[in-house]
Amino acid sequence: MSELNYQKQAQDYYGKAPVIILGSGASAAHGMSGMSALATYLVNNTDISGLSAGETETWVKFCQLLKDKVDLESALHQVTASEELTSRIVMATWTMINSEDNDVFLKSLQDNTIFPLSLLLEHMFKSNLKIINIVTTNYDRLAEYACDQGRIHHYTGFTHGFFRQLALPTEITSVRRANIWKVHGSLDWFQSPLEDTVAISNIKSIPDNYQSQIVTPGTQKYH
């Protein structure tokens, strides 16, 4: 019986272009908050000023569910939030995660070994692969930062630059590329006043008349 050639086996796997899937654990490893911390933040920081009586009642019910130890996603499923209340929840969610995301980015400027994903991608691209697909449910941009540290071009559905517009993959050409598919949206995705979807990089607050396009847990993600 011949001895298994692990190097050849690994090369065969790489040749099949495996998909990398990133869940919340990938972000938690860098100190990003999970659902429990987000739930606490929402209760304490969501702006509920000016809501209607019905919206306020829904908010109180939502907060009580969280205090009763119902998890965030289940709590959001058990209430019917209006478009306005949902917008407030999205804004608070964006504010918290964007701040933590920025902290990780600043740390990465001082430590070029902070992202294990960079090493994985660099290793995978030592094969004949030209494109690697990454699928993530996370709003943060840690996958993008990891690509940058590894000198790997990445595509998230938009053109390059600071103010980015929707683009097909064929519009972005490079010798090798990581496609990052963000199924719940991203911190830098917004609906503009023209009602088109754009991406704006590394901002500390949501611009006036722009709406974050992250999809919070609960019924919103089915819309």
Question: Where are each of the predicted segments found?
Answer:
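Conserved catalytic-core helix/loop/strand module for nucleotide-ribose chemistry
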Residues: 1-223
